[in-house]
């Protein structure tokens, strides 16, 4: 890649970062073109040529994604407040747009989200982000740590990854009822299958929260387990952490062979340290742990 193209991409990346940080602000063409230091007369076409979406469409999808996360996973805001934060002047307009995109009203989505239309609706946003957000890693990004064992409460997800959102929603509701807040009790995902198994029903991941308290299931299927201590190769990922396959493959393809280390008999897992939508999506943080012998 030429220096000129790297500079061009960096200017476009500044725009995406600004949008993520300022979803509550007026993100008109003049504002966002100024962030990249491009002419407003050309920027709309430059943005579309780079990302495959117009600026307006990109902002609309980013706001709607945050709104849908708040509806499904957070209950501190009313539907009206979520609508206003998404840039709508009236709840009815938000409800119409939401139903058109996801086939559900906001209230219905909050109670029982249908995740397949949701995943399809945000495909263009994820594709746009991936144009410039392909992260590259080096050996210096990987640290070897001695990790202590961690007692965890586990909610298992077994089955199609398209329904994972429903399990996450139940997990969040359960940990809240159990008083296990993310600020005081660490959050882990343990992957027990590949990301895209040949049959979707074979997908398997454990949603975990660290705790030394007695576990109250509160009507959910919760079991107690342990993430074993030991040496781990650790890779920190900052940004969109919905899909951690690229950094995971870096650990296996480059980090593991070049180090001479061997993987231990426990699955790859991650700890989630900063969560969207509490932070802008590009500021979310997760750490991948590859257990070593």
Put a short name on every predicted segment:
Residues 1-3, 26-59, 83-105:
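Basic/polar phosphate-binding segments, predominantly the helix-turn-helix DNA-binding elements
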Residues 2-27, 60-77:
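A short, Lys/Arg-enriched amphipathic alpha-helix from helix-turn-helix/homeodomain DNA-binding modules
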Residues 3-5, 14-15, 30, 53-55, ...:
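Short, flexible segments with low predicted structural confidence
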Residues 8, 36, 87, 164, ...:
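Charged, low-complexity surface patches
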Residues 15-17, 39, 186:
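Intrinsic disorder/low-complexity signature
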Residues 17-20, 37, 172, 176:
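Short amphipathic alpha-helical segments enriched in leucine
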Residues 46, 57, 65, 69-73, ...:
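A solvent-exposed interaction/effector surface
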């Amino acid at each position: 890649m030429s220096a000129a193209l790297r500079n061009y991409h960096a200017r476009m990346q500044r725009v995406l970062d600004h949008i993520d940080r300022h979803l509550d602000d007026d993100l008109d063409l003049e504002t966002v073109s100024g962030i990249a230091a491009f002419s407003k007369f050309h920027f709309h076409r430059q943005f579309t040529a780079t990302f495959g979406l117009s600026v307006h469409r990109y902002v609309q999808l980013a706001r709607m994604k945050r709104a849908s996360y708040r509806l499904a996973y957070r209950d501190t805001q009313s539907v009206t407040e979520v609508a206003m934060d998404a840039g709508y002047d009236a709840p009815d307009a938000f409800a119409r747009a939401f139903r058109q995109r996801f086939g559900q009203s906001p209230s219905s989505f909050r109670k029982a989200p249908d995740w397949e239309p949701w995943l399809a609706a945000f495909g263009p946003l994820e594709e746009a982000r991936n144009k410039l957000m392909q992260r590259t890693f080096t050996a210096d990004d990987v640290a070897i740590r001695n990790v202590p064992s961690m007692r965890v409460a586990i909610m298992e997800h077994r089955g199609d990854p398209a329904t994972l959102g429903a399990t996450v929603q139940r997990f969040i509701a359960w940990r809240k009822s159990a008083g296990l807040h993310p600020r005081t009790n660490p959050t882990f995902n343990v992957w027990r299958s590949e990301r895209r198994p040949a049959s979707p029903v074979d997908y398997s991941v454990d949603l975990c929260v660290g705790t030394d308290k007695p576990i109250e299931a509160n009507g959910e299927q919760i079991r107690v387990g342990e993430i074993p201590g030991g040496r781990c190769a650790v890779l920190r990922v900052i940004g969109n952490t919905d899909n951690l396959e690229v950094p995971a493959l870096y650990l296996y393809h480059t980090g593991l062979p070049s180090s001479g280390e061997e993987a231990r008999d426990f699955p790859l897992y991650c700890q989630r340290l900063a969560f969207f939508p509490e932070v802008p999506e590009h500021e979310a943080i997760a750490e991948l742990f590859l257990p070593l012998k």
